[in-house]
Amino acid sequence: MKKVFITTGTEHYLRQLMANYTGGNVTLLQNFSQSLLYQESTGEKLFQEGAEYRVLQSSGSIKGFGVVVFEYIHLRDEEIPIFLQMYQRASLHFSETPGLQSTKLTKAMNMNKFLIISFWDSEVFFHDWKKSPLSKEITNIMRKNNTQSGFSHEDIYHYPEFSHDAK
């Protein structure tokens, strides 16, 4: 089973962790307020702290540049089938979405917290997608079904990482 592991910390600390794990598939992602390490693996996580998600669906391939968007969605048990059906329907159009490199639908290992991870050529393409009819339809359906999507949030990170920390 493929998993995604995420841990956060200062850039300096995360770079030290990366230096210790030369063989691992670990990527440093950053925005202007936060840094995180992202690992995809069928094995064990390389760091002790952080979140663990099971990959439910994956499409596309990562080019090695751009932005990564993390969309966190908390759902009640009865909302999960509706959400999964909407995601499945939307995923049929991902290959046609300009600037979209890859998507991953993941679920936290011990709660009804989903994380949609999408890799984009640039932040502009992501914002264009959010304005698209399909994205708006999904948002409206979630609101109509009284989901907790209003409590969800998204974070945008750049890759490859940039360096603030000369240490």
From Swiss-Prot:
UniProt subcellular location: Cytoplasm
One GO CC term on file: cytoplasm
Spans traversing the lipid bilayer: none
Family annotation (PROSITE patterns): ABM
GO function terms (MF aspect): metal ion binding; monooxygenase activity
ABM domain segment(s): 67-154
This protein's record includes keyword Cytoplasm: yes
Keywords noted in UniProt: Cytoplasm, Heme, Iron, Metal-binding, Monooxygenase, Oxidoreductase
Enzyme class at the top of the EC tree: oxidoreductase
EC number in record: 1.14.-.-
Residue(s) at site: Transition state stabilizer: 129
Chain segments carrying region Important for catalysis: 1-50
Subunit comment: Monomer.
The family this protein is said to belong to: Belongs to the antibiotic biosynthesis monooxygenase family.
Function text: Catalyzes the degradation of heme to biliverdin in the presence of a suitable electron donor such as ascorbate, with the subsequent release of iron. Hardly any CO is released by the heme degradation reaction. Binds heme. Allows bacterial pathogens to use the host heme as an iron source. Release of iron from heme may play a crucial role in the pathogenicity of L.monocytogenes.
Name of the protein described by the UniProt record: Heme-degrading monooxygenase
Organism of this sequence: Listeria monocytogenes serovar 1/2a (strain ATCC BAA-679 / EGD-e)
